[in-house]
């Protein structure tokens, strides 16, 4: 028996990440090869953006994806999020030249307050929300706070790109296959302060840390490389990472929806006080996922260096949050 289609809303749908994302969702890569989807695509009510969205929709139609049960174009979140089961909030205000961080936070607070309110009003009560648009953790916090009738746990931020970047760097250094690396995690904010933690990581049951055995490389090369990878891609490509961000969004949602089969993955989720992170802060944690629910991996020992890194990324997140509290 064929499954009933689920509704997937994507904001910023005509942008670079949207373009790298939509075809993969429609082909079944995110929710499974047996799950039909209806795409509810949101773009700003600007003629150029709406025309670009029309072009993307034409291409989606021209792929004749068997799982694509419908496509809708929207300029209002109140219609785009109607009954949606999954919402990928990709569209955000990018930082322009000479723009202060406070201005960026304020501009995004406006967007994510409106989107949170719309989700609260019209989305499915079980909607799974992934915020991709930066600053992702704080934007997820804003949307969550603007949707008091939805469970806070339904709002997540994307740290999977940092996680995947970290796995790739460790694989290259240690000569491992990237898919063999288990129990890697990234703590904190999706920003250069994130802390990619390899202390528990294994390949074939053996410690990655012991196999690499180079603490100076870990601190002086690995952590800055992962933290500044986005900037390095902009410098090289002249554009921000879009395909890798879309890929991470697919990974995050697929594992949340279909389960991580006991493996650790990194998700930015609202804290309940785990590891001393104040409740409500959207923070990168190691999680396992099953039956559409995530669970933070608890009880991991935190050494002095790790605590220092976690405190640093937490302080940055608290600063961002304090910067938007008056707007909520």
UniProtKB/Swiss-Prot annotation:
The gene is mdh. NAD(+) binds at residues 12-18, 108, 115, 132-134. This is Malate dehydrogenase. One of its GO terms (molecular function) is L-malate dehydrogenase (NAD+) activity. Catalyzes the reversible oxidation of malate to oxaloacetate. Keywords: NAD, Oxidoreductase, Tricarboxylic acid cycle. The active site is at 190 (proton acceptor). CDD domains: MDH_chloroplast-like (cd01338). GO terms for biological process: malate metabolic process; tricarboxylic acid cycle. It catalyses: (S)-malate + NAD(+) = oxaloacetate + NADH + H(+). Substrate binds at residues 95, 101, 134, 165. InterPro entries: L-lactate/malate_DH, Lactate/malate_DH_C, Lactate/malate_DH_N, Lactate_DH/Glyco_Ohase_4_C, Malate_DH_type2, NAD(P)-bd_dom_sf. Its EC number is 1.1.1.37.
């Amino acid at each position: 028996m064929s499954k009933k289609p689920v509704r997937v809303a994507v904001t910023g749908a005509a942008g670079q990440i949207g373009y790298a994302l939509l075809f993969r969702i429609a082909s079944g890569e995110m929710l499974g090869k047996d799950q039909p989807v209806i795409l509810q695509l949101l773009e700003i009510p600007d003629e150029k953006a709406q025309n670009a969205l029309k072009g993307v929709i034409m291409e989606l139609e021209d792929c004749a994806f068997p799982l694509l049960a419908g496509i809708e174009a929207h300029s209002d979140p109140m219609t785009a999020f109607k009954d949606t089961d999954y919402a990928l909030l990709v569209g955000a205000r990018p930082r322009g030249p000479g723009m202060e961080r406070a201005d960026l936070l304020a501009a995004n607070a406006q967007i994510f307050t409106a989107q949170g309110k719309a989700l609260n009003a019209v989305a499915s009560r079980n909607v799974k929300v992934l915020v991709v648009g930066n600053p992702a953790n704080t934007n997820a916090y804003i949307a969550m706070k603007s949707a008091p009738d939805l469970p806070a746990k339904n709002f997540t931020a994307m740290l999977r790109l940092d996680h995947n970047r970290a796995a790739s760097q460790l694989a290259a250094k240690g000569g491992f296959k990237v898919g063999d690396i288990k129990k890697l995690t990234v703590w904190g904010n999706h920003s250069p302060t994130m802390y990619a933690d390899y202390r528990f990581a294994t390949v074939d049951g053996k410690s990655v840390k012991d196999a690499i055995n180079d603490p100076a490389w870990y601190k002086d090369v690995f952590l800055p490389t992962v933290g500044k990878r986005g900037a390095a891609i902009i410098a090289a490509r002249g554009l921000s990472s879009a395909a890798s961000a879309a890929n991470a969004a697919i990974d995050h949602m697929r594992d949340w929806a279909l389960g991580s089969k006991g493996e650790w993955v990194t998700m930015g989720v609202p804290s309940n006080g785990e590891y001393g992170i104040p409740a409500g802060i959207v923070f990168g944690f190691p999680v396992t996922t099953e039956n559409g629910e995530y669970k933070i991996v608890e009880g991991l020992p935190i050494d002095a260096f790790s605590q220092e890194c976690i405190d640093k990324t937490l302080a940055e997140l608290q600063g961002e949050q304090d910067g938007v509290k008056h707007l909520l």
